[in-house]
Amino acid sequence: MKKQYNLNLATPPQRGGTAMLTMDAAAVSSGLAFLESELEKLDPLLREPLTSTTYPRDIEIESGGGWVEATSAFNVEYSVTGGQADGVGGIQNAVRRIQADLSKDLYKVLPYEVSMSIKIQDQLRGAVTGRSIEDIYNDGIRLDYDKYMDINTYLGQAAYGTTGLLNDKQITATSVTAGASGQTDWAHKTPTEILNDIDEAIIAGWTGAQYDNSAIPNHILIDPANFAYINRTMVSVNGYPTPVSIMQYLVDHNIAKAKGVDLVIAECRFCIGAGVGKKNRMVAYVNQRRFVGMDVPVPMSRVMTQPNVGTASYDSLYMANVGQVKIHYIDPFIYRDGI
């Protein structure tokens, strides 16, 4: 119940005037609120949601192509009649002949669409408040597009039958070997055992690519917890910590570096639980357009804006045309679970 504070009036002499006015707590409160709003300092910074997107770091994107429904890539396989060992000329009757087998891969391209509707009075109010609702919506759409691209890059669009860097069905995932502790996770492994996991993945990709040096994996994705662990934990020698972190130890001593390849070990939140049995997954691959990439035939932009009398608003449509992740070489692409 609202308390009413009524002041008792002394009985004044009768002079023909009216009684003195009183004010209750509600009236006083609203008046103070108005005064406080006049005195407050407005913070012009609009705090957006905390989030992150990493797809531009982990895949090369090629723009251009228009509103296509698919993109294609051609492959070639070579063979020689008679085999490669028998290449001696002049002492045989038949000359070997080269053959080429061409094939084409098709990749889906899906339209991205999002709209915004701004009432005319909200646009006019922006002139009073100094904050544009259109700019706020535009920032939200940009963030939504980046999140869409993140999911498309790492996981694909399951509803449309596409996959990403972390879950391609053509790649067989295997578990890393257990360490001396009997466990596979890096938190229970020594720096040398972690390096063995890194090198094993790199060598597996290199071996699968017929030891082609250009196919040595140069990019590794791991979950953020393990990324933090190897960066904050120092390598110990005879029980004494050194000023070298496990991360620096891995970067300096992996097999890829011995072959002249600079290895990047980066964190990716989509690696959490991406493996078999919801284990954390490590992914090793060659981060170059020749090996893996993604087409964006039409980058995201505002394609139209028109007034809508029925809703007293301006409606805008944003669109993009985004392709699925294209893994051109499966053999040097490695999944290792259980880290």
Report each predicted region and the residues it spans.
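Sequence/fold signature of self-assembling virion shell proteins
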Residues: 1-58, 231-339
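Alpha-helix boundary/N-cap detector
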Residues: 26, 30-33, 37, 107, ...
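Assembly/oligomerization interface modules of large self-assembling protein complexes
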Residues: 32-114
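Alpha-helical scaffold segments that mediate packing/assembly in large oligomeric complexes
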Residues: 113-197
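Residues in well-ordered beta-strands of folded domains
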Residues: 117-119, 221, 317
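Hydrophobic, Leu/Ile/Phe/Ala-enriched alpha-helical segments that form helix-helix packing faces
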Residues: 145, 149-152, 198-209, 250-254
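Extended, solvent-exposed, turn-rich assembly/linker loops in the middle of proteins
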Residues: 166-242
